[in-house]
Structures are given as structure tokens and as C-alpha cells.
Design a protein with these regions (language model features):
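Outer-membrane beta-barrel signature, preferentially recognizing the C-terminal barrel domain
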Residues: 1-79, 100-105, 136-140, 180
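Strand-connecting loop/turn motifs
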Residues: 3, 36-38, 79-83, 117-119, ...
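Residue-level detector of conserved, well-ordered beta-strand and adjacent loop positions
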Residues: 7, 20, 125, 163, ...
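Active-site lining segments that contact anionic ligands and/or coordinate catalytic metals
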Residues: 26, 40, 119-121, 145, ...
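Residues on the lipid-exposed face of transmembrane beta-strands in outer-membrane beta-barrel proteins
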Residues: 29-33, 74-78, 88, 110-114, ...
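Gram-negative outer-membrane beta-barrel transporters
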Residues: 45-50, 62-135, 159, 168
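C-terminal beta-signal and adjacent terminal beta-strands/loops
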Residues: 51, 86, 128-133, 148-193
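Short amphipathic alpha-helix initiation/capping segments at coil-to-helix junctions
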Residues: 139-147, 151
Length: 193
């Protein structure tokens, strides 16, 4: 059970004082296993049944009515070396709602985190989304984002970092009317005292 927030009811352009509370029952089962120090896996299945989920459609907060969401999530982790961690996840969602925003049918993630030395850390990830509903006037979105981060601990108090996000310059939308940024590069210094 969740009452609409003050923001959902009264603030900004999406406000809707007629919103009803959300009700939901969620069932989840999960099993995980570490096969060795090198490999671990888990599987989670879920079933969710509810009424009046609050979402934003056509720039207004609305209740969805009755819904059933069910899906499965798979996860693998590996430590082939003490300095390297690999991870992979996949998620599938089936929903009874044709227009459920912000909930892609398929998602995956592949990640690598390498501690190249005591001072240098390099991580990369690939995040993919398929079948994301945005609006009836926008095609369902499917995209992949490749990201890279390099961090160097220059001294006890300072870490220099660089991030490259959306390296492949994928074009996608997650909210109607708001294109997401293409390739982005940023860097900085993080100070710890």
C-alpha cells in the first residue's frame, strides 16, 4: 500500500490531486550458489499483482488500474583473479499493462572491474535495454550503453578520475520529449581528508 506523495498530487506540471493509493502484493523467490571462489550465480523469480500503480503519462500522473507483473532475474559473478571481478545480469519482465513506463521488457548488464595496481583501477560496463515503453508516439526503445572509468590514487588524499559514458553515442529516450545525452567525457579530482 502506498499513498500518492505530495509531489505526485500537487507539485509541478504532472500533479494530479485525483490520484488513488497504490496497492500491491509481491511474491519473490531466489536461489543463489557459489560454485567456487571463481564463480557464483543466482536466479530470482517474482510475481506482483496490484491496482492503481502511479506513473506519468502524457505529462500527468495517473493510476494504471489493475496490473500483473512477473519476471525473472539471472546473475553471474566471477573472480578469475584477485584483482579482477566480472559480473553479468539479465532481467525479463512481462506486464499486463501495454503502456507501463520506465519498465523495459529486457535488461542486461556486463561489467568488469580491474585493480591494475594498488593505485590504478579500471572498470568498464555495458548496459542494455530492450522494449522500453515511453509513449504511444515514440517507438519502444532498445539501446546499449558502453561506459569506462579510470581512477588513479595519486596520493593519500587525492584520486584523479576520468569517465567516458555512452562511448558508442547511442541515441535513446526514456522520457518523452527528453533525449538522453550522447557520448560524454568527464574527469576530476576527488579529495579525501
Amino acid at each position: 500500500y502506498r499513498n500518492p506523495s505530495f509531489r505526485e498530487l500537487y507539485l509541478y506540471r504532472m500533479a494530479n490531486p485525483e490520484l488513488e493509493p497504490e496497492t500491491m502484493m509481491n511474491y519473490e523467490i531466489s536461489v543463489g550458489k557459489s560454485f567456487s571462489r571463481y564463480l557464483g550465480a543466482s536466479v530470482t523469480a517474482y510475481y506482483c499483482k496490484g491496482d492503481n500503480m502511479i506513473q506519468t503519462l502524457d505529462m500527468k500522473n495517473q493510476n494504471t488500474g489493475r496490473f500483473i507483473n512477473k519476471g525473472v532475474e539471472l546473475s553471474l559473478t566471477s573472480h578469475p583473479f584477485s584483482s579482477l571481478m566480472l559480473s553479468a545480469t539479465y532481467s525479463y519482465l512481462h506486464t499486463s499493462l501495454e503502456n507501463l513506463t520506465g519498465a523495459p521488457r529486457n535488461q542486461y548488464y556486463l561489467g568488469a572491474d580491474w585493480h591494475a595496481s594498488d593505485r590504478l583501477n579500471i572498470s568498464a560496463d555495458l548496459k542494455g535495454v530492450g522494449g522500453l515503453y515511453v509513449h504511444e508516439s515514440v517507438d519502444r526503445q532498445s539501446y546499449a550503453l558502453l561506459n569506462l572509468k579510470v581512477a588513479y590514487q595519486a596520493c593519500r588524499y587525492a584520486c584523479v578520475f576520468m569517465r567516458l559514458e555512452n562511448i558508442t553515442d547511442s541515441r535513446y529516450v526514456i522520457n518523452r520529449g527528453y533525449d538522453m545525452p550522447g557520448f560524454t567525457a568527464l574527469g576530476g579530482v576527488k579529495l579525501n581528508f
